């Protein structure tokens, strides 16, 4: 018995070590088969915002932002750490800014995604340390077609890759040391919008690789996934005979695409090396963002050539197994098609940069089971009451969103310019959604067989039966909200507000708010809460409705 107790205690001790060693966040497949972010043991969706590039460069400026940011109802902030500040001299590391970020976020109940501005940011190398920039022999540059150096660090330079990876590993090791128990930092992004603004790197090292065999890892990936390859990659490969060996020119032809594919492979393997160095010690989820192709006719180099644009996602998937998510930065109007491109079976949807448009957030969380929506320059949005209230509504619905994430029991609603209505089947009901304004958006969750939670603004929902022998009706419509997961009704809607229970009218939530005297300015944070005591304005934002239905 004594031996048994000793054995149990030993394995309990080992289990304790295992639990402590576990990272606070991870990606899993939920029961719906959808990717889900788990934070501190619970499903988590990032209602996020990304800071401007320089906002976290001093503690003073950063500290002025926390209180204003809280008014936007965020739960996560994406913030940069620059290599030039973290390792100002080689081998000397400054933890001031990462400490400030973690402590500030923790005090304000926020999670963090850390963006590593290392070798590249927006295709340039301006965030590399001075000691890297000045040593052009050790850390050589990309060469243009004329053989001249440009300021961008070459992805073919092993010295740069190892120096970058070392610094990032030290940063992540420190995050593990100070934050593992609390789990404030939940995701990492190595580099930012990588790629070069030309067709290829003409450095000696690059030209040597271009003449070598295409890595078998890519060939085998293409063979295995041939039926699902992006058309841009598949068509070039097949037009050149779908060869399974040979140089980049042999396999993909002597053209702009072969140059782009090999450039992409190099960037992806470089960043995978950086990511792997960190994951080895603290395997937080890793995502890589990209500057999108702006026009269909744009060739590589018009946009940063080498980044994970949709055309070359398959190359990234083959080359960078330590990168969990390829993430689009979306400022283009074709939002629905872009997110559909990036939401794949092997790639959950995560949007680290976009515009401050709440409709986008409702769409990606409702329609695509997204992990994150994050407007860029989030501090500029302080005072945007509609956006803040939209995030509040999403937060109220979070238990239901995470419960049904990725299933057919949740959909997004967002009107596009050419759309007049949408019809969708949910369980035994056929829902016809019509729009009352251009800015119509929200989500619909079938929480029970005959109960729907509808959140949104400026649209109507008609409930019909999928069985032609039956008719669908609305039983009741309650307007209200959720506090800590508990429903609190504000009104029972009927009569004019539902056309006598013929339709759900998502008019929105009306809030009377004091008129703001001053716009937010980071240098005058005390002014954000200065209001006129006698002036009020009505603000409309998404509302929440519980709809019970029946068939007869």
Question: Where do the protein language model's features map onto the residues?
Answer:
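Catalytic-core region of carbohydrate-active enzymes that cleave or remodel glycosidic bonds
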Residues: 110, 273-284, 311-404
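The substrate-binding groove and active-site-proximal loops of carbohydrate-active enzymes
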Residues: 46-57, 80-98, 145-166, 178, ...
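Bacterial Sec-dependent N-terminal signal peptides
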Residues: 1-22
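Aromatic-lined substrate-binding rim segments of carbohydrate-active enzymes
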Residues: 61-138, 267-281
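C-terminal beta-sandwich/jelly-roll accessory domains of carbohydrate-active enzymes
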Residues: 453-552
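N-terminal carbohydrate-binding accessory modules
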Residues: 21-74
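Aromatic- and carboxylate-lined catalytic core of secreted/periplasmic carbohydrate-active enzymes
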Residues: 22, 363-499
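Polysaccharide-binding and catalytic clefts of secreted carbohydrate-active enzymes
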Residues: 138-313
């Amino acid at each position: 018995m004594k031996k048994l107790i000793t054995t149990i205690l030993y394995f309990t001790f080992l289990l304790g070590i295992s639990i402590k060693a576990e990272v606070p966040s991870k990606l899993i497949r939920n029961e719906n088969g959808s990717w889900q972010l788990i934070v501190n043991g619970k499903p988590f969706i990032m209602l996020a915002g990304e800071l401007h590039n320089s906002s976290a460069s001093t503690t003073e400026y950063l500290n002025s932002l926390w209180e204003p940011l809280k008014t936007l109802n965020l739960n996560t902030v994406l913030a940069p750490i620059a290599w030039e500040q973290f390792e100002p001299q080689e081998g000397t590391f400054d933890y001031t800014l990462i400490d400030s970020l973690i402590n500030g976020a923790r005090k304000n109940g926020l999670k963090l995604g850390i963006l590593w501005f290392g070798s590249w940011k927006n295709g340039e190398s301006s965030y590399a340390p001075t000691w890297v920039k000045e040593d052009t022999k050790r850390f050589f540059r990309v060469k243009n077609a004329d053989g001249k150096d440009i300021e961008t660090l070459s992805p073919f330079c092993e010295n740069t890759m190892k120096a970058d990876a070392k610094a990032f590993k030290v940063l992540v090791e420190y995050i593990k040391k100070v934050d593992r128990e609390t789990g404030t930092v939940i995701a990492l992004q190595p580099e930012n919008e990588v790629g070069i603004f030309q067709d290829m790197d003409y450095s000696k090292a690059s030209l040597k690789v271009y003449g070598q065999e295409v890595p078998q890892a890519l060939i085998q990936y293409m063979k295995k996934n041939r039926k699902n390859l992006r058309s841009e990659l598949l068509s070039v490969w097949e037009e050149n005979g779908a060869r399974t060996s040979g140089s980049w020119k042999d396999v993909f032809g002597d053209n702009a695409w072969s140059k782009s594919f090999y450039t992409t492979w190099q960037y992806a393997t470089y960043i995978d090396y950086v990511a792997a160095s960190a994951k080895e010690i603290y395997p937080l989820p890793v995502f890589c963002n990209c500057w999108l192709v702006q026009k269909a006719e744009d060739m590589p180099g018009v946009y940063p050539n080498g980044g994970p644009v949709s055309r070359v996602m398959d190359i990234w998937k083959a080359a960078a197994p330590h990168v969990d998510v390829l993430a689009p930065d979306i400022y283009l109007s074709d939002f629905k098609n872009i997110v559909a491109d990036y939401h794949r079976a092997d790639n959950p949807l995560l949007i680290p940069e976009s515009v401050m448009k709440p409709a986008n957030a409702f769409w990606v969380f409702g329609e695509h089971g997204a992990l994150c929506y994050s407007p860029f320059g989030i501090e500029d949005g302080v005072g945007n009451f509609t956006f803040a209230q939209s995030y509040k509504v999403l937060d109220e619905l979070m238990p239901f969103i995470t419960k049904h994430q990725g299933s057919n029991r949740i959909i997004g609603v967002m009107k596009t310019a050419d759309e007049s209505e949408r019809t969708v089947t949910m369980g035994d009901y056929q829902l016809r959604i019509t729009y009352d304004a251009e800015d119509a958006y929200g989500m619909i969750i079938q929480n029970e067989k005959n109960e729907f939670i509808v959140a949104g603004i400026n649209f109507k929902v008609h409930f019909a039966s999928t069985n032609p022998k039956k008719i669908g009706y609305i039983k009741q419509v309650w307007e209200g909200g959720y506090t800590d997961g508990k429903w609190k009704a504000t009104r029972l809607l009927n009569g004019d507000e539902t056309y006598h229970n013929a339709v759900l009218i998502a008019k929105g939530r009306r809030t009377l708010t004091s008129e703001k005297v001053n716009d937010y300015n980071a240098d005058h944070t005390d002014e954000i809460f200065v209001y006129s005591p006698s002036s009020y304005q009505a603000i409309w934002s998404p509302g929440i409705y519980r709809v019970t239905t029946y068939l007869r």
